[in-house]
A protein has these predicted regions:
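Canonical Rossmann dinucleotide-binding motif of NAD(H)/NADP(H)-dependent dehydrogenases/reductases
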Residues: 2-37
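Catalytic loop of short-chain dehydrogenase/reductase
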Residues: 13-24, 93-127, 135-176, 188-190
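Active-site loop of short-chain dehydrogenase/reductase
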Residues: 6-8, 82-85, 130-145, 176-179, ...
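N-terminal Rossmann-like NAD(P) cofactor-binding module of classical short-chain dehydrogenase/reductase
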Residues: 88, 92, 140, 244
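Conserved mid-core segment of classical short-chain dehydrogenase/reductases
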Residues: 60-71, 75-78, 86-112, 131, ...
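Conserved Rossmann-fold SDR core element
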Residues: 164-167, 171-193, 235-245
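A glycine/serine/threonine-rich, flexible loop-to-helix segment
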Residues: 51, 176, 188-212, 252-254
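C-terminal helical subdomain
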Residues: 120, 183, 202-247
Length: 254
C-alpha cells in the first residue's frame, strides 16, 4: 500500500466518474491525501461528480488557455491548502477536424488548439502551480503512446508527442527544485473523451488481444494507481519518465 498522508494534490481533467483523473482523486483520498479539483465548461457536472468521491473536494474553474485563470490559480487553490505536493495534468482536446483520418487536411488553427490544450498546457499548469509547490513534489500527466501513428488519432498523436517532449524539458528545468515530472501512458479506456475520437472502436477491439497482461477498456484503475504511485514519495529519483499502464502493448507492437 502506498500511503500519501498529509499531502495535497491538484487534479485537473475530471469530467465523469469513468475518467482516469476521477480515479486518481479517489485513490489519492483513500490513501490519505487532500484533493482539489479543477473543471472547465461544464462546472455543474464536475461539481456533481466531485460529490461521488469519498471526501467531496472543492472544485475550481480552470481553462488552460486562459492566462487570467492560470495566473490566479495559485491564489484560488491557497484558499483550500497552503501547499501543493502534487499536480495531475489530465487535460486534452482536439477539434473533430484534427481526428479521424483527416490528417492531411487539418487547418493550422485546429492543430494549434490541440497542441495548446493537450501539450503546452502541461508547462502552463506547472508554472501556475509553482508558487504553492515550493521545493519538492511531483507533476504527473496523462498520456497515450505517441511513438507510432495510430489509426484516426492524427493530430492528437502529434500533440501527445509534444506532451512527452514537454515533460522531459520540465523534468530538466524543475529538477533543481526537487520537482519530478512524469507521464502515465494508459491503454484505451471507454471514457467520454475517448468516445469522441472517430475510430476509437478499433482500439477497443484490438487492444485486449494484443496486451500480454490483457486489458479492460472499462477499468481506469491501473492507470490511476500508476499516477498515485508517481505522486507519492516512492519514486524519489524518477523524473522525465513515461510509465506505460497499457497491459504491455507498447512492448510488443502490432
Amino acid at each position: 500500500m502506498i500511503r500519501t498522508p498529509r499531502i495535497s494534490i491538484l487534479v485537473t481533467g475530471v469530467l465523469t466518474d469513468s475518467s482516469i483523473a476521477f480515479h486518481v482523486a479517489k485513490i489519492a483520498q483513500q490513501e490519505g491525501a487532500q484533493v482539489v479539483l479543477t473543471g472547465f465548461g461544464r462546472m455543474s457536472l464536475v461539481e456533481r461528480i466531485a460529490q461521488r468521491l469519498p471526501d467531496p473536494p472543492p472544485v475550481l474553474e480552470l481553462d488552460v488557455t486562459d492566462t487570467g485563470q492560470l495566473d490566479s490559480l495559485a491564489g484560488r487553490v491557497s484558499a483550500h491548502t497552503s501547499r501543493l505536493h502534487g499536480v495531475v495534468h489530465g487535460v486534452a482536446f482536439a477539434p473533430q477536424s484534427a481526428l479521424g483520418g483527416n490528417f492531411l487536411n487539418t487547418r493550422w488553427e485546429d492543430v494549434a488548439t490541440a497542441v495548446q490544450v493537450s501539450a503546452y498546457s502541461l508547462k502552463a499548469l506547472a508554472i501556475a502551480a509553482l508558487p504553492l509547490m515550493g521545493s519538492g513534489g511531483a507533476i504527473v500527466g496523462l498520456d497515450f503512446d505517441a511513438s507510432v501513428a495510430w489509426p484516426a488519432y492524427d493530430w492528437m498523436g502529434v500533440a501527445k508527442a509534444g506532451l512527452e517532449s514537454c515533460a522531459r524539458y520540465l523534468a530538466r528545468d524543475l529538477g533543481p527544485r526537487g520537482i519530478r515530472v512524469n507521464l502515465v501512458a494508459a491503454g484505451p479506456l471507454r471514457t467520454m473523451a475517448a468516445k469522441s475520437i472517430p475510430g476509437f472502436a478499433e482500439f477497443e477491439g484490438l487492444w485486449p488481444d494484443r496486451a500480454p497482461l490483457g486489458w479492460d477498456i472499462t477499468d481506469p484503475q491501473p492507470a490511476a494507481r500508476a499516477c498515485v504511485a508517481l505522486l507519492s514519495d516512492w519514486f524519489p529519483a524518477t523524473t522525465g519518465e513515461i510509465v506505460h499502464a497499457d497491459g504491455g502493448v507498447h512492448a510488443v507492437g502490432g
